[in-house]
Amino acid sequence: MGRTLYDKIFDEHVVHTEEDGTAVLYIDRHLVHEVTSPQAFEGLREAGRKVWRVSSIVATADHNTPTTGWERGYDGIADPISKEQIVTLDKNIQESGAAAFFPFLSKRQGIVHVIGPENGATLPGMTVVCGDSHTSTHGAFGALAHGIGTSEVEHVMATQTLLAKKAKNMLVKVNGKVAPGITAKDIVLAIIGKIGTAGGTGYTIEFAGEAIRDLSMEGRMTVCNMAIEAGARAGLVAVDDKTINYVKGRPLAPTGVEWDQAVAYWKTLHSDADAKFDAVVELNAAEIVPQVTWGTSPEMVLGIDAVVPDPDKEKDPSKRGAIERALTYMGLQPGKPMDDIFVDKVFIGSCTNSRIEDMREAAAVVKKLGQKVAKNIKLAMVVPGSGLVKEQAEREGLDAIFKAAGFEWREPGCSMCLAMNADRLEPGERCASTSNRNFEGRQGAGGRTHLVSPAMAAAAAIHGHFVDIRQFA
């Protein structure tokens, strides 16, 4: 019987299988940042161990790094705990001898899930782990990638392996072509809206169908980034020419004979025609409209042409209660049109949507509208995903477009996605955000988050409220 893409990668990395089915899985790439690594490095020291395979590590500071004040260097990091974590990462990586390190203030520093792919550290067929939930991003390359906990970070550092039980296989097919103006973010939010945040629990999801194949590599990264928000362990897209062309020539990609050998293998990284999936979900791409979340979970999402749901129309008591709680927290009334929701702040960034194509998408809307940020917007900020993205955007003049309209153009980092630095919402503030989670307090205590695409966020900044960007497509 044929094998799925997930089966192929998982099986080829099994070192040993226990009687209960738990596998010892070899890990090819270990992405490291400043928040979940200090305890792991300290654990190695206390046990008298060293990092088993230093060359597998790619490290950067991203969660705590400030997006302003870089001219002051490390003194620009206001929070002492944040500063300590960043300094500690510098020391730990230096001590470990890892060469692929992109520290705070360096040209190639950025969000770990942005700098990994752009440096060629993420390759098809790899197993990739990181002490971060959104490691699933790297599945866009036909790699098996998922987040791990701090104790597992230490385990991988010490042994280059991870204990794992094989997940079930889910195929999500997005059939046909999307309408103009519909983005990867809209596609993945529509998927989550359909299957729910528990729909993928126990599964690894392979994303397929014409709409997925049509996406660029950056679009596929956006989709796989949010596989975890559908409850899945990981998300995958089969390798094709787009994958190979994206990787070619990047600093950490193979070259010469090794490149030829790698490409020959990568071309096998797709599910066989007779592969069996445990679950199949299908969406019609033509039916997907610009998406906006209204509640406190990514599954609480609707099209821009919809209205805020009425809990009284929900028959399930638990679901009705969840809707009521979400509406209370979000300060929304049932029946309110989604395009009549005004926002206070706009955040364009995060590991979901901070790459160069995201910057171009948002800037194109701003340029087309030709107006300033609306008066009710307290802050509209654009945070590139890496130093290289920032440089490229500035070469293209995108920063000038944003700044002329009243946006703040910031330094790279995770920023307002999770409010671990100074970028955050105040209680009651409402934000149009291109990030991946709209949980209570995610962007700051009492903050209200609406997840949207970069184009939708840019349009909301100019109009002051959500609008249907299809009219600008």
From Swiss-Prot:
Its EC number is 4.2.1.33. Pfam families: Aconitase. GO terms for molecular function: 3-isopropylmalate dehydratase activity; 4 iron, 4 sulfur cluster binding; metal ion binding. Pathway: Amino-acid biosynthesis; L-leucine biosynthesis; L-leucine from 3-methyl-2-oxobutanoate: step 2/4. Binds 1 [4Fe-4S] cluster per subunit. [4Fe-4S] cluster binds at residues 351, 414, 417. One of its GO terms (biological process) is L-leucine biosynthetic process. It is an enzyme of class 4 (lyase). Keywords: 4Fe-4S, Amino-acid biosynthesis, Branched-chain amino acid biosynthesis, Iron, Iron-sulfur, Leucine biosynthesis, Lyase, Metal-binding. It catalyses: (2R,3S)-3-isopropylmalate = (2S)-2-isopropylmalate. The keyword Iron-sulfur applies. Its cofactor is [4Fe-4S] cluster. Heterodimer of LeuC and LeuD. Belongs to the aconitase/IPM isomerase family. LeuC type 1 subfamily. Catalyzes the isomerization between 2-isopropylmalate and 3-isopropylmalate, via the formation of 2-isopropylmaleate. This is 3-isopropylmalate dehydratase large subunit. It comes from Acidovorax sp. (strain JS42).
